């Protein structure tokens, strides 16, 4: 059914000229599976991560835990990782990654990237899929709360095939895909970059390969931190804090 609503017309505005190119959105596929294992739901964590629900007040604002229909950061903490093993399975373009019920796989993007995390997810029964991520591995695992924020995206899926992509840009190299309460298949896992485009026109050559590595690292740092202004960082705080940048 259609619901009528009132619309308003926004007056035309004289916008400031951008003077810089629009970002590039190249799709970077996950390159390999680096770890796999099982999940045990319903386990209380030894050191619970409180998140920000305890800081809700008239100044901080937000939604208290009691009024939330779902509380993903509390739910994901009750998943215990067991029987984890290191693997090294290359991913060809579009090759499927099977996840039986209550299992995980860790995907490697090859380097730290900033942008929108996406994949094609297929399931034949209801399943909750968590895409948790971080820039590094901590004891061969993805520690999604390491940066003091909830670095994961949950999907509560009915049977079907879904093409999902995060609404906000994040920074990551490793992605821990978790299938809880059901099985699923992941295909075409990727990160859609959100970066400054013109830095790729620069070239560098040296007889010392270490210098070339440093140059490429500097280029990656710049394109991710300078989509339009020099930002504090491309992950937690995408803002132009001048004293930091």
Language model features: what each stretch is:
Residues 1-236, 240-244:
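Extracellular/oxidizing-compartment recognition motifs
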